[in-house]
Curated annotation (Swiss-Prot):
Its EC number is 3.5.1.44. It comes from the Bacteria. The gene is cheD2. GO terms for molecular function: protein-glutamine glutaminase activity. This is Probable chemoreceptor glutamine deamidase CheD 2. It comes from Chromobacterium violaceum (strain ATCC 12472 / DSM 30191 / JCM 1249 / CCUG 213 / NBRC 12614 / NCIMB 9131 / NCTC 9757 / MK).
Length: 201
């Protein structure tokens, strides 16, 4: 796939929404200047949807901070990991014509979906990091749906900046993604049962 469509992407045609779609898996990101539907499945991981309305460039990443304490100071390995995940996406968007000072964010995920989680909850750490990062970079958060006990399937329409969130019951597909990028899920929808709540923001 060419650079304009980003790296590590999985493209298909979504018959329901009648649009070219791209699945973004754990540890990946996708930037585009085309009308696309970016799709990901989240448990404790976080997805950041970025848009530059002027240039029409948009993108999404999907990441999980390494295990550790709640200390996310700039010098910690967890903070460096998170910053790198954000900078990879932003750099690709800039190559397509986006301006950093025009970026707007919508953030999702960080659900506490794993059984037997430690005192330091993974979702809380990811939430603290991404809010702090975006504040420091002066990137406004237009919408968010974070924490809670559910998994989420995220549909990001890059042409409009709109995001459809499907709240999911705990499922095998979501739980698998809580293992830090061990293996790939062939079908992100497999085993996921849609809950009662859909959000369109």
């Amino acid at each position: 796939m060419n650079h304009a469509e980003g790296m590590n992407s999985h493209q298909y045609y979504d018959k329901h929404f009648q649009i070219t779609a791209v699945k973004v898996f754990p540890g990946e990101f996708h930037a585009t200047n085309q009308s696309r539907l970016l799709v990901t499945l989240l448990g404790s991981c976080v997805a950041v949807c970025l848009s530059d309305r002027i240039s029409g460039v948009a993108g999404m990443n999907h990441f999980l901070l390494p295990e550790g304490s709640l200390d996310l100071g700039a010098g910690t390995s967890a903070a460096r990991f998170g910053v790198n995940a954000m900078e990879l996406l932003i750099t690709d968007m800039q190559k397509l014509g986006a301006m950093r000072n025009r970026l707007e964010a919508k953030i999702f995920g960080a659900g506490n979906v794993l059984d037997g989680m430690t005192v330091v909850k993974v979702g809380e750490r990811n939430t603290n990091f991404i809010r702090s990062y975006l504040a420091n970079e002066q990137i406004p958060i237009l919408a968010e749906d974070l924490l809670g006990e559910c998994a989420r399937k995220v549909y990001f329409f890059t042409a409009t900046g709109k995001v459809l969130i499907k709240k999911l019951k705990k499922s095998g597909a979501a739980i698998k993604q809580e293992q830090p990028y061990r293996g790939r899920i062939v079908d992100q929808g497999e085993g996921a049962k849609t809950g009662d709540i859909d959000l369109f923001i």
